[in-house]
Amino acid sequence: MAKWGSPFVFALACLALSWRVYGDDFDLYDALGDPTEKPKPKPPKPPKSPTHDSGDLDLSDFFDTPVKTTTKSPRLPPKQPDLRFSTTTKKPRTTKIPPKKSDPNDFDLSDALDGNNGKGDISDSDLDDILNDGYNPDKKKGGGGGGGGGGRATGQGDNDGSDTGFGSQAETGTIAGIASALAMALIGAVSSYISYQQKKFCFSIQEGLNAEYVKGEHMEAVVSEEPQVKYSVVESQSAIP
């Protein structure tokens, strides 16, 4: 049995070698191990417990990776231009006028003030002194000095007289207006009284005609009824034996 065992093993080895040679091409890589080993498959992850109500539908349950919440603010839509008409109007730009440099020789109203006048200029006090001295340029109404004062008093009297005349004219106009108003009221009262009397007269004539008409109707009724009365009296007399 030992004699036949070793040749039998040798024959099987030769058969396997020939099958290897004829069945596939010879390659030195066959002597080496498999260079590209396939990665081991990852074990399946356990199902994630839901954080919300199990009865609600959530699309994140179909994905293994957790959903990342973004904290980025949403993009605002572009601002639309306001097409409505605005009532505000911009102030027009104007060029500023440069200040004019004052010339000491120009006319200025402030020169008439007493504080700005020099010693040799005319002021209000000079005019007061002239009036207090009794100066009057109108020579026809008086002479110099006291005569001028009398002329001034006369002028004031004339002014008072003109004012009195104006007041009398105003009073005359007022009296005329009152008189015209009274006259119009009197004329209106007379005309209304006349129209009232005319209407009253017309109604009295109408009432008289109506009374005569009614009276005539009664007379005709009496005349038509008298023969019947007489006939009834004759019948009653004939019936008496």
UniProtKB/Swiss-Prot annotation:
GO terms for biological process: cell adhesion. The chain crosses the membrane at residues 174-196. Its main location: membrane. InterPro entries: CD99L2. Residues 24-173 are extracellular. Residues 197-241 are cytoplasmic. It is a single-pass type I membrane protein. Pfam families: CD99L2. GO terms for cellular component: anchoring junction; plasma membrane. Residues 143-154 have a biased composition (Gly residues). Belongs to the CD99 family. This is CD99 antigen-like protein 2. It comes from Xenopus tropicalis (Western clawed frog).
